[in-house]
Regions:
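Structural motif
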Residues: 18-25
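Actinobacteria-biased recognition of intrinsically disordered, low-complexity terminal regions
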Residues: 1-6, 140
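Basic helix-extension-helix modules of the SAP/HeH family
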Residues: 4-13, 38-40
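Amphipathic alpha-helical segments that form the core helices of the histone-fold
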Residues: 15, 29-42
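N-terminal non-globular leader segments, chiefly Sec-dependent signal peptides
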Residues: 4, 23, 32, 123-126, ...
Length: 140
């Protein structure tokens, strides 16, 4: 018999990975896993490794340390209104339809993820609200 204590950590890995892509139905998410070779013959360890990889690309929360991007560059898609925002450890690049991109330094980002509001405080202390996050994706 397999160790039943493996179930909770496996389900937690599934939760984190799926929360990073909440627009997908669970069957669609499982189909994506199948495209990566995770099917009937996969081990729990292989499943957890793929779920962790998925959560690394599309995390449930933007990885922050002290209100700033912890590492890498991230694409944040936000709706209502539509924004494409690139966040780095030091700068924000905001792109909207039919406008020029804007780049500025920031002080902090509030904790955010899909389905949550996206708010950034600039270096002058002003808070900028960018709607609701629909997707996070690691760029580098």
């Amino acid at each position: 018999m397999d160790d039943p204590t493996r179930i909770d950590p496996t389900l937690e890995s599934l939760r984190r990975a799926w929360e990073g892509q909440p627009n997908l139905s669970l069957p669609t998410f499982f189909a994506m896993l199948a495209n990566q070779g995770i099917g009937w013959g996969a081990t729990d360890a292989e499943l957890v490794a793929e779920l962790e990889r998925q959560a690394g690309v599309h995390p449930p929360l933007l990885p922050l340390e002290g209100g700033r991007i912890a590492a890498g560059e991230w694409l944040v898609l936000a709706d209502a209104p539509t924004y494409r925002i690139t966040a780095t450890p030091t700068h924000i690049i905001v792109r909207r339809p039919d406008t020029q991109p804007v780049v500025w330094a920031y002080e902090s980002i509030r904790p955010t993820g899909p389905g949550r509001p996206f708010t950034i405080r600039d270096t002058e202390g002003f808070e900028h609200r960018f709607g609701v996050v629909s997707s996070l994706m690691r760029l580098s």
